[in-house]
Regions:
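Acidic/polar low-complexity segments and flexible, solvent-exposed patches
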Residues: 1-75
């Protein structure tokens, strides 16, 4: 799995999820339930991951949507 985005913006997480769902790219959102522990302060970022084989396509979809500035460095 490769990390695409790390953000505290839950609306952005939802939008990216919708873009990836629309392209039939399976993704995983990590740390989305950590707000229960942190008290909903938004301190801990949510991370969006995709399978290695979907990484290039997912990055292109986000870039096409104008979200390239949100992408994590591709390692």
């Amino acid at each position: 799995m490769r990390e695409l985005v790390r953000t505290n913006d839950i609306v952005l997480v939802s939008a990216i999820g919708a873009l990836l769902d629309g392209a039939n790219i399976h993704h995983l959102v990590l740390d989305q339930n950590m707000s229960i522990i942190e008290g909903s302060l938004g301190i801990l970022p949510r991370r969006i991951l995709v399978h290695d084989e979907d990484n290039t396509e997912a990055r292109q979809i986000l870039a096409d949507a104008g979200l390239s500035h949100e992408l994590r460095p591709d390692e």
